[in-house]
């Protein structure tokens, strides 16, 4: 199942992406909130409802109205927090070397992350660049993991239970 956040006119919505089309989940089931944050706060019950709707649309059981005029947003447009992790050793070593810094000795010992600006999350579309900063840009692959329920000091064996997507 692929969930999307999108905007029609001035309102943000939560949808499911099926076979190249977006369908509003709240229109299919009024118990599902019409935004990603409230949906994620609803936990597994809402996730299960959304999966059933997605399967019903895919299987032709539910004839849902497709959204036609929309703007895609970031999947979670207003996250409550955001962390960025150091994932690729080669990239970190190269970036540090370019700044004349030694590699972080603890890199291989435990996960390294930092808190980043959760208000800077953007969806697809035009990106405004600052030309005077091009020499300092550091391009890299980014991946997101959306946590769907509260937890603290979660062991690796239980981590998948906390991932919403």
Question: Where in the sequence are the language-model features?
Answer:
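Active-site microenvironments in enzyme catalytic cores
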Residues: 1-11, 17, 31, 38-165
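Short, surface-exposed terminal/edge motifs of secreted or surface/virion proteins that either
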Residues: 12-26
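A hydrophobic, small-residue-rich beta->alpha segment in the mid-to-C-terminal subdomain
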Residues: 23-36
């Amino acid at each position: 199942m692929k969930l999307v956040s999108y905007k029609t006119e001035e309102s943000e919505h939560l949808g499911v992406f099926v076979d190249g089309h977006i369908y509003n989940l709240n229109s299919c089931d009024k118990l599902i909130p019409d935004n990603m944050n409230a949906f994620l706060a609803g936990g597994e019950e809402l996730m299960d409802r959304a999966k059933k709707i997605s399967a019903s649309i895919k299987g032709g059981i539910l004839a849902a109205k497709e959204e036609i005029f929309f703007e895609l947003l970031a999947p979670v447009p207003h996250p409550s927090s955001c962390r960025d992790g150091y994932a690729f050793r080669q990239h970190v070593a190269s970036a540090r070397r370019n700044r004349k810094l030694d590699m972080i000795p603890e890199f291989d010992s435990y996960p390294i992350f930092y808190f980043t600006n959760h208000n800077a999350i953007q969806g697809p579309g035009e990106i405004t660049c600052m030309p005077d900063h091009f020499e300092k840009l550091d391009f890299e692959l980014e991946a997101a993991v959306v946590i769907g329920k509260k937890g603290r000091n979660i062991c690796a064996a239980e981590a998948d239970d906390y991932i919403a997507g």
